[in-house]
Regions:
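Phosphate/Mg2+-binding loops and adjacent switch elements
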Residues: 76-133, 137-149
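Solvent-exposed alpha-helices and their adjacent loops that cap or buttress functional pockets
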Residues: 38-39, 47, 69-71, 101-104
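P-loop NTP-binding site
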Residues: 8, 70, 147-150
Length: 150
């Protein structure tokens, strides 16, 4: 995703990323005021400067759609995780990490992988789903842009 962001930025696009964490993440740096405030019971904190802000809010659930509303000026919003969402997906399948696609085939746009040809053939995915080399961010970026801006 970081390489894709560099490519999109070079093309003049403003891109946001929403990441789903299946675990409970630590949203701040230990020792900061806002970290201590959260640890002391604040249900939310915000820190900001002239050029950016960070908002942390204890909330049981928020949808990717609600999160996307924080970025109305974005040209493109990438989602990481969210394997069960209704948005189109490029699934990453890494050798030694996953052996099958877990995404809804109707939402699967492509697969980015480091599997060899024989291992790819063994995957049970739709025939019309394109494969990309995992490290070929330029081709993946062009695929995203051609689909998104058509």
């Amino acid at each position: 995703i970081c390489r894709l962001l560099e490519i999109f930025k070079d093309k003049g696009l403003k891109v946001a990323v929403l990441k789903h964490d299946g675990h409970d993440f630590v949203p701040d740096v230990p020792g900061t005021d806002t970290y201590c405030q959260l640890q002391s019971g604040a249900y939310g904190t915000a820190v900001f400067s002239a050029g950016k802000y960070m908002l942390v809010k204890q909330q049981p659930q928020i949808s990717e759609k609600e999160l996307a509303e924080f970025f109305p000026e974005a040209d493109l919003i990438l989602l990481e995780g969210f394997k069960y969402s209704t948005y189109p997906k490029i699934e990453i399948i890494r050798k030694g990490n996953s052996a099958e696609s877990v995404c809804n085939p109707e939402k699967l746009m492509a697969i980015a992988t480091n599997l060899d040809a024989e291992e790819r053939d063994a995957l049970s995915v739709l025939e019309n789903v394109p494969f990309f080399e995992l490290d070929n961010a330029e081709c993946i970026a062009e695929f995203i842009l051609s689909d998104y801006f058509r």
